[in-house]
């Protein structure tokens, strides 16, 4: 018995006990040590007996028996001969499954280079030998000789020789030197390398060299050499002399019916290798001519290449059906490869799938499960119960009963299923709410019934969607399903913290209908004692549902102790609202119910309920809302008839007016007054406006009706038109869709996105004619094509996001940092896009928040801001708060809970072990399909209107100016002379209300700190030209303004005024090239004037195209324009929107024409120009002058002599995130990416919390470039994980050494995923071959920190409930390391006796367990 226990133990070797996976190069000896024998023959199985051939690819002697515990010849059978090796056939008697583990090997007659290390760029062999790949290939494939040992000759080691050169050299020096070809030569060179010496040489070279490219190349080689030294890999192992053979059950040969066999491609590839190898051996024995041997060696090299990576070099070897054979590399890479097909995406047992239908009577935690499915899924449980209760004596009998579907089986099934949660999943699972747990209710029929409120989370509808069912088997799994995944625990969305269990469609319509009020309804003005009486009155037909009445309402309000106290008031309300109040949970205010409830209001109800009362009452309330909504939607009898689409009478006159305008424009075009482009834009504008007017008339018509009230007076009220109610409540449809039903369809777009200028004037009620229908099909088809593309693109974005963020887990409570990011309300122009409270809700404060204007602490640091504290912030009008952020978190491999803040789906501080990276990726990726794929073309008409020329304030308050320089002109107005001036309006409490950017040269009517009133225009400027503003008063003196050389004179025909236009440098005659046209201001005596407060002469250089309207010696006053520079009217710009924009931001792509930012602070000047570029110089107060070449066509925002700050805009354009990071730091780049991504989502009405985007930004900022390495393990210019540098720096600080300096680097998400520390994760993402090659050469260790690596190696992930498990494991390891225990032999025996189990004991304890399980039920 002892043996059996031992044996069973040995069978289930636990693979849990490892912490690191290391990858490296296998030495020939290692390959031989894995092997169980050499494969000598290419045969597979005997065609007569179907037994494996001896020494062949399936040999039983090498790989193990074909049948369990039976040798090949049949001499030994059964368990008792276990471990015997049969003397006849040489097969060990053991289990068949060893054929999945035992490897063989092939001794190669000639060395062969491993194609991965040769061809995977950069070629490792090439890098080591410092030879180009082309040359190495010529040696390997027998085209050239390579000198291995030059001896006393004047050849160099590693020099290539052609046939002729080799023969010449042999004639000349005989056997003084040694040159070879093929893999032997490369192997010899690699073997001869002295790695430490080579490293020394390279280090010296690195010190001496100055060229950047050379440095890069040397650093690369140095890293590779050091990797070899550290990992203990030998370079010559990249050339193989022994080839391992995969176990045969992993490349099976399967008999098909009809006597044919299906085989794995690998067998073909191995056969080729063995054939060629054997032939080569024979040729070598026969001492065949060199050329034949050489050819055979080349073929061997090619066949091994094909086995390892078919198609990497030359043409892929194809099988009998012209299809390339699948090599070892193909097995692991790509979507169908081992990683993504079998390790990251496994199929699951105990699962089923079926169509879903509605279950309107279910509770939120229930789902309807068809009896048939349940019976099949819970089979093992039913068998166990049948046996333990004595209905069946054996499993077989139980099976029979289940198949016969005896009556008792159904009773037991009901018992088994009770409180056993099951998981429902709808593909595509875009976020974690795509899998939720429910308690099953057995139902007749074959469709799964789903609760309507969870449809939003699953994105399910009932038009034929299918869902999968999974059964959690173990007790732990059931517990987790119930505690974490139950639908009742997932009320809030993890993306934004708002309820995701919200009613839609019918329910919304029902509640809206129920809470509407009506003028002069039956029984208006009644007094009712409570909602019960209201319901009674309604049921007996005394009142209508919408009648306005007075009802006594009892609300429950929490007192100081936190207990509910009733408060009763008489309230003006309607019957419907009073009835709805009956389902309200205790503690909700009636005011929330006493309104017409649309979709938003209902969502707010559930949110308030959750925040005030917690989960349980909210879930019950949500269910009640649903039942009530369905009931009253049925009562309302809303239906859509054609007469509900009321066409406004004004429609036809609006359309005819528009047609007249269009005809007029057409006439203007034909007489040449407007260009074709202008005509097109104007026509489209006219029709767009007409469409708006029709829509407005239609909505006015639809949305209100006139009724007679109790006094007999006419009164307007909201209409009870069904279509209007559906749109108004948010149940279905929108104003835009109603416009197409009853207004006019309007303008349609062509598939390329341009607008067709003839609109569809008909609507769907009138019907479209053939032409109109044809035009409208354009748009519809494009919509469908877009959707398909969008889904794929969005899925790929999600995959990249998950991959980059998967290893980010909350691993500690507080990292103790004082850093954070400053949050302010998002204000664009005159409106608040997002209030401060919405941005900081659920964050932790990084520094004490003070009451504005005092030193009083409102909120202490490290406090989590909840709704109550946000109210405090609001009431004290705080307008900026420093909150902690994931980006500034100091935790090394992960983040801390304090920096993350609130768990949005639960409403409290996030727990340790939460996988915030994956949550963030899913939250950003899930709405991806709702984003557009389009690039928006803005027509000329639209972009012309977009240029503002003044600022009109919307709120009364105080005006504030930031980064401002100005001069005051004669009229007392301010003229700006600074570039990025920001103007804000602040209210009486000091809150920012409006925020504008004001351009250079704008004229302000109010100054800093002055009061402004709403509607006042505070600034205006000319949008088409940029002035050069005089900063002093004086007389104009022209410098280098020479007619014909640098300027031309133009006279305006209409006004007769003449102006001077400065020529571009390129257009000037040679004599004028070096002249620098400028205007200097002098006083009456002709002396220079200095700009006040500086020692700079008032002299203004004029760029090309500048227009001067003054004459020489004219008098100018301060603040007047000296010249104007026309701003080139920017044509139609494409704005990348939607998904592509989000992808660009996360991939950190550089825009086409990026903005140019100042690299340092200093004074701007221009140096010598080249053909197409100008030289911009920035001279700082001290230090080196910085210079940059800028293309001439870029419009610059700075003049000569102007002061700029580091990071200021020099030329407009889209900013590059890399520049922002380099010049303005981590905070600025975070803010930029977060705001830009949010902009796209906000446009689509999708809410995502900022912190999800910050999580991704943190992952993009994981790496840094070492700038000063000192004597650390890093190389300068090396890309390293920031966390690693921080760890090293902490150590160095303790030792008192100087700290390693580094610059943060921003990587796009794909790059960042591939640059992750874990090679397993990177390999399973993209470019598998390259990643594995790199990892093997460097002998990388994978610490298995992330989720992906752990899923792949089959362990619990270190997140969620697995987080604690891994922590405990590590604690145990540490403890066992600390306490070595030595036992005496007697002790050991005693312990062994205690642990020995007899068969009786085992049976007894098993029975006991089953009984316990029974009792538990």
Curated annotation (Swiss-Prot):
It comes from the Bacteria. CDD domains: RNAP_beta'_C, RNAP_beta'_N. Its cofactor is Mg(2+); Zn(2+). One of its GO terms (molecular function) is DNA-directed RNA polymerase activity. Zn(2+) 2 binds at residues 815, 889, 896, 899. It is an enzyme of class 2 (transferase). Its EC number is 2.7.7.6. One of its GO terms (biological process) is DNA-templated transcription. Zn(2+) 1 binds at residues 71, 73, 86, 89. Keywords: DNA-directed RNA polymerase, Magnesium, Metal-binding, Nucleotidyltransferase, Transcription, Transferase, Zinc. Binds 1 Mg(2+) ion per subunit. Mg(2+) binds at residues 461, 463, 465. The keyword Transcription applies. It catalyses: RNA(n) + a ribonucleoside 5'-triphosphate = RNA(n+1) + diphosphate. It holds the Pfam family RNA_pol_Rpb1_3. SUPFAM superfamilies: beta and beta-prime subunits of DNA dependent RNA-polymerase (SSF64484). GO terms for cellular component: DNA-directed RNA polymerase complex. DNA-dependent RNA polymerase catalyzes the transcription of DNA into RNA using the four ribonucleoside triphosphates as substrates. Belongs to the RNA polymerase beta' chain family. The RNAP catalytic core consists of 2 alpha, 1 beta, 1 beta' and 1 omega subunit. When a sigma factor is associated with the core the holoenzyme is formed, which can initiate transcription. NCBIfam families: rpoC_TIGR. This is DNA-directed RNA polymerase subunit beta'. It comes from Pasteurella multocida (strain Pm70).
């Amino acid at each position: 018995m002892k043996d059996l226990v031992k044996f069973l133990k040995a069978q289930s070797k636990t693979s849990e006990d490892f912490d690191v996976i290391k990858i490296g190069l296998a030495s020939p000896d290692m390959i031989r040590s894995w092997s169980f024998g050499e494969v000598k023959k290419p045969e597979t199985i005997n065609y007569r007996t179907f037994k494996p051939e001896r020494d062949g690819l399936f040999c039983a002697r090498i790989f193990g028996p074909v049948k369990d515990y039976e040798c090949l010849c049949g001499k030994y059978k059964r368990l008792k001969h276990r471990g015997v090796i049969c003397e006849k056939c040489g097969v060990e008697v053991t289990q068949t499954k060893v054929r999945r583990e035992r490897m063989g090997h092939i001794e190669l007659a000639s060395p062969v280079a491993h194609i991965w290390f040769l061809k995977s760029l950069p070629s490792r062999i090439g890098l080591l030998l410092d030879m180009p790949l082309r040359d190495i290939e010529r040696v390997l494939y027998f085209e050239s000789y390579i000198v291995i040992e030059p001896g006393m000759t004047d050849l160099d080691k590693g020099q290539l020789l052609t046939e002729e050169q080799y023969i010449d050299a042999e004639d000349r020096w005989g056997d003084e030197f040694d040159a070879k070809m093929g893999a032997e030569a490369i192997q010899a060179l690699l073997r001869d390398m002295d790695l430490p010496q080579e490293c020394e040489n390279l280090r010296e070279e690195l010190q001496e060299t100055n060229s950047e490219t050379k440095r890069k190349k040397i650093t690369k080689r140095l890293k590779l050499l050091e990797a070899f030294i550290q990992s203990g890999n030998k370079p010559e192992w990249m050339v193989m002399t022994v080839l391992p053979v995969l176990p045969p059950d992993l490349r099976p040969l399967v008999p098909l019916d009809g006597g044919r066999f299906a085989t794995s491609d690998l067998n073909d590839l191995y056969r080729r290798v063995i054939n060629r190898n054997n032939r080569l051996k024979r040729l070598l024995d026969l001492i065949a001519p060199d050329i034949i041997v050489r050819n055979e060696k080349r073929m061997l090299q090619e066949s091994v290449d094909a086995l390892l990576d078919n198609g990497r070099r030359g043409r892929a070897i194809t099988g009998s059906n012209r299809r390339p054979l699948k090599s070892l590399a193909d097995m692991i890479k790509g979507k169908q490869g081992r990683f993504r097909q079998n390790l990251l995406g496994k199929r699951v047992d105990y699962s089923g799938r079926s169509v879903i239908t509605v279950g309107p009577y279910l509770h939120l935690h229930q789902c309807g499960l068809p009896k048939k499915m349940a019976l099949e899924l819970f089979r093992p449980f039913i068998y166990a119960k049948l046996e333990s209760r004595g209905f069946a004596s054996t499993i077989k009998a139980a099976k029979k009963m289940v198949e016969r579907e005896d009556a008792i089986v159904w009773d037991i099934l009901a018992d088994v299923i009770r409180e056993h949660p099951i998981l429902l999943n709808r593909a595509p699972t875009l976020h974690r709410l795509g899998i939720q747990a429910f308690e099953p209710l057995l139902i007749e029929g074959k469709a799964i019934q789903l609760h309507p409120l969870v449809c939003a989370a699953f994105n399910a509808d009932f038009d034929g969607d299918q869902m999968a069912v999974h059964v959690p088997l173990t007790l732990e799994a059931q517990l987790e399903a119930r505690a974490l995944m139950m639908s009742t625990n997932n009320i809030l969305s993890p993306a934004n913290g708002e309820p995701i269990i919200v009613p839609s469609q019918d329910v919304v319509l029902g509640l809206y209908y129920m809470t509407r009020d009506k003028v002069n309804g039956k029984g208006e003005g009644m007094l009712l004692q409570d909602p019960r009486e209201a319901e009674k009155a309604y049921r007996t037909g005394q009142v209508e549902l919408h009648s306005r009445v007075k009802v006594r309402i009892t609300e429950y309000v929490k007192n100081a102790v936190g207990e509910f106290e009733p408060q009763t008031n008489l309230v003006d309300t309607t019957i419907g609202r009073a009835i709805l109040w009956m389902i309200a949970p205790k503690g909700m205010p009636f005011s929330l119910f006493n309104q017409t409830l649309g979709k938003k209001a209902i969502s707010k109800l559930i949110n308030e309920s959750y925040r005030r009362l917690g989960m349980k009452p909210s879930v019950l309330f949500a269910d009640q809302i649903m039942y009530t909504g369905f009931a009253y939607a049925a009562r309302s009898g809303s239906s859509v008839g054609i007469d509900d689409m009321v066409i406004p009478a004004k429609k036809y006159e609006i359309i005819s007016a528009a047609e007249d305008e269009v005809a007029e424009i057409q006439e203007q075009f034909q007489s040449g007054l407007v260009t074709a482009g202008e005509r097109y834009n104007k026509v489209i504008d006219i029709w767009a406006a007409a469409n708006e007017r029709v829509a407005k008339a239609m909505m006015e018509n639809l949305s209100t009706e006139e009724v007679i009230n109790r006094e007999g007076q006419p009164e307007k009220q909201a209409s009870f038109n069904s279509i209007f109610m559906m749109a108004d409540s948010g149940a279905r449809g929108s104003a835009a869709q109603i416009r197409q039903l009853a207004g006019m369809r309007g303008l349609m777009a062509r598939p390329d996105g341009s607008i067709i200028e003839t609109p569809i004037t008909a609507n769907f009620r009138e019907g479209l004619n053939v032409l109109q229908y044809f035009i409208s099909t354009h748009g519809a088809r494009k919509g469908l094509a877009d959707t398909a593309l969008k889904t794929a693109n969005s899925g790929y974005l999600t995959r990249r996001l998950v991959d980059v963020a998967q290893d980010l887990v909350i691993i500690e409570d507080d990292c103790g940092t004082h850093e954070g990011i400053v949050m302010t309300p998002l204000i664009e122009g005159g409106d608040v896009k997002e209030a401060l409270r919405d941005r900081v809700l659920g964050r932790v404060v990084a520094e004490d928040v003070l009451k504005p204007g005092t030193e009083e602490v409102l909120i202490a640091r490290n406090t989590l801001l909840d709704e109550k504290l946000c109210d405090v912030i609001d009431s004290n009008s705080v307008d900026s708060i420093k909150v902690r952020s994931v980006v500034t978190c100091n935790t090394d491999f992960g983040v801390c809970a304090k920096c993350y803040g609130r768990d949005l789906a639960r409403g409290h501080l996030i727990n340790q072990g939460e996988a915030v990276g994956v949550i963030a990726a899913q939250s950003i990726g899930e709405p991806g399909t709702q984003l557009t794929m389009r690039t928006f073309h803005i027509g000329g008409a639209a972009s012309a209107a977009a240029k503002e020329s003044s600022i009109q304030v919307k709120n009364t308050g105080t005006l504030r100016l930031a980064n401002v320089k100005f001069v005051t002109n004669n009229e007392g107005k301010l003229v700006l002379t600074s570039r990025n001036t920001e103007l804000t309006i602040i209210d009486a409490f000091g809150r920012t209300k409006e925020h504008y950017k004001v351009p250079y040269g704008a004229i302000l009517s109010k100054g800093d700190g002055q009061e402004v009133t709403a509607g006042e225009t505070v600034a205006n400027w000319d949008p088409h030209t940029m002035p050069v503003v005089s900063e002093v008063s004086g007389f104009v003196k022209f410098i280098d303004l020479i007619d014909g050389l640098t300027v031309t004179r133009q006279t305006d025909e209409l006004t007769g005024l003449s102006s001077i236009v400065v020529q571009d440098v390129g257009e000037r005659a040679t004599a004028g090239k070096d002249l620098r046209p400028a205007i200097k201001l002098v006083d009456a005596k002709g002396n220079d004037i200095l700009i006040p407060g500086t020692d700079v002469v008032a002299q203004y250089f004029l760029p090309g195209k500048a227009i001067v309207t003054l004459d020489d010696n004219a008098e100018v006053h301060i603040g007047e324009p000296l010249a104007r520079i026309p701003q080139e009217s920017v044509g139609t710009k494409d704005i990348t929107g939607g998904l592509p924009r989000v992808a660009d931001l996360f991939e950190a792509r550089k825009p086409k024409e990026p903005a140019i930012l100042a690299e340092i602070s200093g004074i701007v000047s221009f140096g010598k120009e080249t053909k197409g570029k100008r030289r911009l110089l920035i001279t700082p107060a001290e230090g080196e002058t910085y210079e940059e070449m800028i293309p001439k066509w870029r419009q610059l925002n700075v003049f000569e002599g102007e002061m700029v700050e580091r990071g200021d805009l020099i030329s407009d354009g889209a900013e590059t995130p890399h520049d922002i990071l380099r010049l303005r730091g981590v905070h600025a780049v975070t803010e930029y990416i977060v705001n830009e991504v949010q902009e796209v989502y906000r446009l689509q009405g999708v809410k995502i919390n900022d912190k999800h985007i910050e999580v991704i930004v943190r992952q993009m900022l994981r790496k840094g470039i070492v700038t000063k390495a000192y004597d650390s393990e890093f190389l300068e210019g090396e890309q390293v994980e920031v966390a690693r540098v921080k760890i090293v720096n902490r150590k160095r600080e303790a030792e008192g050494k100087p700290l390693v300096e580094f610059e943060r680097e921003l990587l796009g998400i794909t790059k960042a995923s591939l640059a992750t520390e874990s090679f397993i994760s990177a390999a399973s993402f993209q470019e598998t071959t390259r990643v594995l090659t790199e990892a093997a050469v460097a002998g990388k260790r994978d610490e298995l920190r992330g989720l992906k690596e752990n899923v792949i190696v089959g362990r619990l992930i270190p997140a969620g409930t697995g987080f604690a498990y891994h922590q405990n494991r590590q604690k145990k390891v540490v403890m066992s390391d600390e306490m070595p225990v030595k036992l005496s032999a007697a002790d050991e025996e005693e312990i062994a006796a205690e642990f020995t189990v007899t068969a009786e004991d085992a049976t007894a304890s098993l029975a006991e367990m089953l009984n316990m399980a029974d009792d538990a039920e």
